[in-house]
Amino acid sequence: STKIVLVGAGSAVVGVRLISDLVFTEGLRGSHLVLVDIDSERLDMVYRIGTKLIAEQDAKLRLSKCEDYREALSGADYVITTVARGGAGAWLNDVRIPQAYGYNYAVGDTMGPGGLFRALRTIPLVVDIAREMEEACPDALLINYSNPMTAICRAVNKYTSIRAIGLCHGLQNTVRRISPRLGLEPSEITAWASGINHFIWLTDIVHSVTGEDLYPKLVERAKKMPSEQPVAYDLLNTYGLFPSGGDDHIVEFIQYYTSHECGKGAAHNIDLNYVEKAVAHQKQELEELEKLASVPSLRATDAIQGTAESAAEIIDCLSNAKTGVFMVNVPNNGRIPNLPAEAVVEVPGITTPSGVMGVQVEALPLGIAGRITACIHEFELMVEAAVHGERRLALQALLINPFTRSRVDAERLLDELIKANEPYLEQFR
């Protein structure tokens, strides 16, 4: 049977939804799912909900749990990582502390100081997991959901022999957002994109049934500058392609939308209190899950929705020799011709008997490729700083970021964030 290990299962909402996806994937019946998390209480809650889901659907899934990933990896076929060291407190620090130095962004999990320190906390753990996989399950596929996606996947590819892909729901969310503008249901739209995670650009958008090219309609809507996603539509007007990922993510890559001149994001409806609201929402969802786990009469199937993620479907395809096409983060190696070969890029990928293969796509417009290339160099500095624990490289990652206006402030910010993250930065001690 297929053995799937979910590391970070205590990221409760994601963990439960991934279990739900697996439960409802017919081709994975008989599989063994191992839940792993260092938070024993959260792990037990997710395990109880998973047990409910399996029983309600008679899913024939074997479910087990443990707190140490090293105990779970032996013989695994797939290892899914959804880890976020430091939790909500670290995430809030990633956004709030830099704001005092003029770094204004919403999500803060990909680029700049927030992305850097999430990388410094997370990359060593995921690389350690991959190194353990080299001994315990060398042929397994690592499927990463943790952010910053590009940097984490690059670190695994660069410093281990483990095959790794990264998955994100950005394109699905974009299709859902633009479908009302096109007068269609999301299911009526087929879209593909390329770029880097949280900064991919729609290359194709067609009607799923008729094959009609929907890009001209999207361009026409952009001329009216809709109030929803004004940054994305502004970029469509500028570059001729529509960026996927949502404005809250996109502004981490392009600093002027949250500059003082743009009212710190107000001119483009960017909410700099995004993280506080997200943390409050997560807390509410967690309370609902705790109730679901502890009240026998509540049905898990009625309460849990799937993720719109593709991990379960990809595992089904790979395990049962099916062909599917998905958005994946993989090493570039020429797939996007005008981006660095060693970079991790997000492109369509096809499941094959030998794994998930990213497809060759067209070169991106020069203006977009130039921005992405600068980001790729920033990610490379994050990887090196995280793996080697070098403050100098972390500073260089800050200095290359377009939000940085002062070396002195960048050094002060770096010291403050290192101190705030001290429990999670073993490599800097």
Where is each model-derived feature located?
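N-terminal Rossmann-like dinucleotide-binding module
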Residues: I4-G30
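Glycine-rich phosphate-binding loop and adjoining beta1-alpha1-beta2 segment
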Residues: F24-D58
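Short glycine-rich, flexible loops that bind phosphorylated cofactors or substrates
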Residues: S31, G87-A88
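Short acidic low-complexity segments
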Residues: R62-G75
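Redox-cofactor binding/interface segments in oxidoreductases and associated redox assembly factors
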Residues: S74, I80-T81, N144
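Rossmann-fold NAD(P)-binding glycine/threonine-rich loop
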Residues: G89-K158
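Internal, well-ordered domain-core segments that constitute the primary functional module
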Residues: I129-I200, V206
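Long, compositionally biased stretches enriched for glycine and/or charged residues
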Residues: P180-R429
